[in-house]
Structures are given as structure tokens and as C-alpha cells.
Amino acid sequence: MGILSSLLLLKRNQKPKMLKDIPYFFNGPAPYIFAHRGGMSVRPEQTQLAFDNAVDYGLDGFETDVRLTKDEELIVFHDATVDRTTNGSGKVCDYTLKELKKLDAGFHFTDINGRHIYRGHQQAKILTFDELLEMYPSKYINVDLKDTPSSYEGAIAPKKMYDIIKHHHAEKRVLVTSFHKKQNERFRAISNGEIATGASQHEVTEGVIKFILGLGYHYHPQADTFQMPIKFKGIPLSSTHFIQWLNLLNIVPGYYGINSVDLMYDLYQKGVHTIVTDRPDLGKQFKSLLKQHLSLIHI
């Protein structure tokens, strides 16, 4: 894209007159580095083993997911079934919490040498969302409501989520999102702006299309942040101009699947606020590099 066309695109996507306020969740020093499912490349995902490891590396928080059990408990879990990550089989919603707690969430995890080093580990257990907030009171939590809106679990999960967050007085350190637009709408209606929310895939797609067409000034999102991959179906989503446009709208830009220190630094320089990685060790390397860079600037 040439300089003239870039300037014209930004002009056409100019800042609207009325903007949403940026929630307190994003008030900390940027960038935030979050461990994806606790850092799933190096520890069994969504377990205390993973979250403790991310804390040890000094990351700011976690990106995680929740699903509802048979007895209506919110657990920290990604898949609709337990097969991929545990020694169990079947749907999460067909298990009670007590039954899920008996499963080995480190059963299928392998290290770089192909060894199952965390099978049977006491800290390789499924956690509830309540336990996660209790165990890590100083960490930011970016949580994705996974149950589909049309299911019974999906219908009641947003209210369950809200009640747990309120119980822990965690309104300022939790970001709630979902790939499903309906779930985001439900949670926003319940929380009434108290808690930061992310964009659904539909909301992100709408924003990207309007930006590309130069109709960005017609975009009035409810979401506080976009969380995206670097590209989607061949369409790049991390251009400097797109990130600038998001910041102009007070939509906090965030990217996931970032497992390169160089890419983390590139995104930071473009104005990205939140970076989600599978590798907490790389997150720590980046934070150290950034600290050195900033100290040199201020000499």
C-alpha cells in the first residue's frame, strides 16, 4: 500500500466524534502478555501446572476458556469433550464436577521428547473458574465463554460467570469474551458495563470489512477489544493502519498465537496492547528485551 493510499484510508476511517471509554481492565502498563491456556506448549493446558509456570515467568495473566458441567459448575476447559486432554471420554456437560476432578488432565501431554511427564500429577487436574480467580488474585484473566448460545449450558453460563466474578470482586481484572455474538450480548446485558468484554468473530469480521472498504467511521462496536490472529483465511489482520484505526476507536488491539519474540516486538511497536502466547518463556524474554530497550531510551 502506497503512502498516498494509506493516508486516504486513514482519512476515510477517521475517528468518530463519540467514543466508548476504555475499561479499567486495560489501565495497566502495556503490553499485557498472557499465557494461552496457561502456556499449553510447555505444560498441560488449563491446569495449575500451566498457570503456576506462567506466574513463575512473570506474565501478566492468562487467556482461558470455560464450560458448564452437568451440575452447572463453570470449569476452566476448552473443548466440548474431555477426550483430547484427559483420560476420559465424552462431553463435558455429561460429567459432574466431582467426576471431572477424577480425570487426569495431564494424560495426553507430551514434552519435546515425546514423554508423558505429567501423567498422574496432582496439579494436572481440571479447575473451576472460581478456583482460578481464588488461586491467582493478582493476575488478569481473559476468559472465553465456550458453550454455544442455543444450548442449555450456553443460556445460563453468562450469568454464572458474572456471579463468580462479582463474588471475587474481580470486575477490574477479568475480560469476558466469546466467539459467539449472542453470548457477548447476553453477558453485556447482565454486567451492564461493569466488566470489559471482547468481540465475537462476527463483530471482528464486520469491523475488518468496514475498515477495508473505508467505512470505519460507520462502525460502532460494543466490544472493548479485538482479539485476533495475525491473519485469517489469508487476510492480514496486523497492519499498522488497521491497528491505528482500532486505537482511534478505543478498541484495544490484541493478538493470539504469538510465539516469536520478534513478532511480539513488531506488534508492540505497531501499537498492540495484548499479546497471547503458548510459550511463557518467550513472553518473559520479550518483557526483558522491552525493559532493556526502554531503559536505553530514557538514558
Name each region found by the language model.
Residues G2-K17, H78-I190, E194, P221-L249:
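Metal-dependent phosphodiesterase/phospholipase catalytic core, i.e.
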Residues I33-A35, F62-T64, I141-V143, V174-V176, ...:
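Hydrophobic faces of well-ordered beta-strands that scaffold small-molecule active sites
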Residues N53-R67:
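Catalytic domains of carbohydrate-active enzymes, especially glycoside hydrolases
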Residues S6-A35:
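N-terminal amphipathic alpha-helix/helix-capping segment at the start of soluble metabolic enzymes
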Residues H273-F286:
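Glycine-rich phosphate-binding active-site loops on the catalytic face of alpha/beta enzymes
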Residues I297-I299:
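Conserved small/polar residues in nucleotide/adenosyl-binding loops
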Residues R37-G38, E45-T47, S178, Q201-E203, ...:
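Glycine-rich beta-to-alpha transition loops that act as phosphate-gripper elements at the mouths
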Residues E185-F187, V261-V272:
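Catalytic cores of alpha/beta
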